[in-house]
Amino acid sequence: MAATKANIYFKGVEIPTSSHPEIKKLKKKSNVHYMHGNKVWNSTLILMELFADINFNKEKIADLGCGWGALSCFLTKKGADITGIDSDVNVKPYFDLMCKLMDVDTKFCVQNIFSDEFDISPYRTFLASDVCFWDVHTDLWIKFINKIIKENKRLIMCDPGRESFWNLLDQCDMPYQIINRRINSPRRVDSYITIFGE
């Protein structure tokens, strides 16, 4: 379905935009996001479309840089045992609102995924959409990818094709699969899905 000013209706769920009344209330009383968790990014919709017909059957998934949690909550409805992870504590009220709108109880964790303290052992699959903003993080992502591949885990990354994303792929020695995916509704989105690991 098409987007309204305040909502996106997609794959059977309601996703608030920055114009949603509850989002406006949160922005008035909440701290400013210091990362990029200030909206639902387009690559999230691409992954939602990709996973729409899959029953995850309690698969343990980590949604890295989850922001408002649209993907986390959507996959909870699809049967995943998913945790939304973000380094910005200020996205938590937005994540809670998303849970309320989608009628789910999805786990949320504040964590720097590049820290040695981040325990990857509970998860089989890691998702990351629209996270490649800065070249300064390229080495950190490569280290993280190497870490999970050695543990026979996988990362599914989605990005519209930023220069920093291509730089990451150029510098990463690990094999990967890449797919270009497009949707025309509720927004016109063109992104690249990259899969590291089996």
Q: Where are the model-predicted features located?
A:
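S-adenosylmethionine-dependent methyltransferases
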Residues: 1-198
